[in-house]
Each structure stands twice: as C-alpha cells, then as structure tokens.
C-alpha cells in the first residue's frame, strides 16, 4: 500500500533528522528528562516507520487495519511526546496533549495484536 510506504518513510526520515538535532543541538537547551522523552518518541517512530515499510509488502488480509493503527498510533504517541518535550522552553501549555500519548500507545499495541493474529491464522 502506498500510504504505508509514504508514512513509513516519513516516520523514519523524521526520526533520523530529529535524532541528529536532539543529539547535537537540543541537549544544550533542554533538560535531560525532555531529551530522554524525545529519544523515546523518536525510537518508537523509527520502529513503526520500519514496521510500516515491512507490512506494506506482506500479503496479509488485515494489512489495512494494521497500517491505519500504526499511522494514527504513531502520530498520537510520538508527536504528542515531541510537542510536550518542548513545553519547558516555550510559553505555551501543551498539557492537553498528555492524554493522547497513551491512546496512541494503545493503538500501536492493537496494531501489533492484529498483526500477530494474522500470522497465527496463516496457513
């Protein structure tokens, strides 16, 4: 599916770019707790970006569900953490994004469960 390839590549690209920015620039302006949060966010974005690229070529019936759960889950989980991590240096309050992080995580877990189910059902 084209959507999985586009989002997968985009997620990997964002992970690499922000990983470099985080390592070489942000460590000098953000507290360690925010740097660690950004690392987690980018790691999960990378995992699920690569997952989307792999899933896009697999012949599984439930592919559409897994792809949508991974895309929406990654956007909610990783982007909410990224934005919240910059709260300490901005004048904005992004606290309302906090509840989106676990929702995104649940969507990612659901995608993995559906993928596992499709592999178990495989003949």
Where is each model-derived feature located?
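Polytopic transmembrane helical bundles with strong interfacial aromatic enrichment
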Residues: 1-123
């Amino acid at each position: 599916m084209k959507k999985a390839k586009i989002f997968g590549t985009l997620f990997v690209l964002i992970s690499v770019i922000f990983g470099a920015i985080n390592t070489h620039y942000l460590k000098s302006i953000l507290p360690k707790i925010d740097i660690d949060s950004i690392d987690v966010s980018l790691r999960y974005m990378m995992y699920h970006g690569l997952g989307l690229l792999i899933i896009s070529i697999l012949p599984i019936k439930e592919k559409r569900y897994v792809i949508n759960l991974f895309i929406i889950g990654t956007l909610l989980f990783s982007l909410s953490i990224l934005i919240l991590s910059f709260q300490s240096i901005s004048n904005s309050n992004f606290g309302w994004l906090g509840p989106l992080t676990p929702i995104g995580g649940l969507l990612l877990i659901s995608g993995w469960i559906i993928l596992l189910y499709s592999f178990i059902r495989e003949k």
